[in-house]
């Protein structure tokens, strides 16, 4: 989860988020090198006497500044495309959970179980217990097994929503009449928080998401108690 005055990304909890953080560092380094080169050229222009003012063309320079940007774009595009394909790939999910966005709460249905479904509302600030997080706690958490691929089917009952959990690298639009899917895989147990990331009305800020990732045995005990 995020902390006050945090400057970086949240700790990665899934393979996809780890890839996204590596891609972020990769792209940031390229941007840093380009910015340094531009600043260096500007400083030379400001401190050096202008020469070759009558030169009309320079084939070598034009070739370099055509090929070099193309190479840089390829270095950015290839890792990006790889991650996009990884995010769309779902191999043998052990569990499918259907998520529906409403104004202004989420509902969940475990399609592999009969009658295992519930609504998840934000806990009002006045009802929070000591240590609980304002605007992030819910009355019913989404309990899922860790270290296993889980398919999330995401849609909306009314307006556009977006189901997002940053530490897992997840952000999928919930669109009325359309069923989107995403893969959830957590490397470790714990509570992972997210929020609706699409402005959906006056209470848009009050649609938190809480995933509780637990070992498989604990998940089986929880699902048995819920049915």
From Swiss-Prot:
Enzyme class, UniProt record, top EC level: translocase
User: What does the Swiss-Prot or TrEMBL cofactor note state?
Assistant: Binds a dinuclear copper A center per subunit.
Query: What EC number(s) is this enzyme filed under?
Result: 7.1.1.9
The way this protein sits in the membrane is described as:
Multi-pass membrane protein
Q: Which Pfam families match?
A: COX2, COX2_TM
Give the keywords, sorted: Copper, Electron transport, Magnesium, Membrane, Metal-binding, Mitochondrion, Mitochondrion inner membrane, Respiratory chain, Translocase, Transmembrane, Transmembrane helix, Transport
Mitochondrial matrix compartment: which residues?
46-59
Write down the chemical reaction(s) this protein catalyses: 4 Fe(II)-[cytochrome c] + O2 + 8 H(+)(in) = 4 Fe(III)-[cytochrome c] + 2 H2O + 4 H(+)(out)
Function, in words: Component of the cytochrome c oxidase, the last enzyme in the mitochondrial electron transport chain which drives oxidative phosphorylation. The respiratory chain contains 3 multisubunit complexes succinate dehydrogenase (complex II, CII), ubiquinol-cytochrome c oxidoreductase (cytochrome b-c1 complex, complex III, CIII) and cytochrome c oxidase (complex IV, CIV), that cooperate to transfer electrons derived from NADH and succinate to molecular oxygen, creating an electrochemical gradient over the inner membrane that drives transmembrane transport and the ATP synthase.
Name of protein: Cytochrome c oxidase subunit 2
- This chain's source organism reads Apodemus mystacinus
